[in-house]
């Protein structure tokens, strides 16, 4: 995991230090050394990079023309919209992310497999922007709605249907 040994607070003969200041990689003492800071930043990133997350799973039509992508509390509405689209004769699938950092290892492979990918977010598109930074050559459509309310399935179906027609 890359985690260092921690003395359990109260263990006799051990000193326990907590706080937000940068520590020396060698001693654990507070350090303002730029090289140490660089090394500790790389160490923290390696811990994140080594987290094992499951592969991304796609639900819906395996031969979909449109992949709908979401995360968080949008799952039910997006799945309902994808199911309705498939029932209406469209070919749609859903990839709902549970892990964003690190991303599932198969993220780029999944997103690049589909003719069209739409990222549905209840914000201004931070996830789509993140993927554009992380995945070279990715082409994404966006559905962004910031109303403080859940997505309306009918709105999603209408938007996704028009997107397939383009």
What spans do the regions from the language model cover?
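Flexible, low-complexity linker and terminal segments
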Residues: 1-166
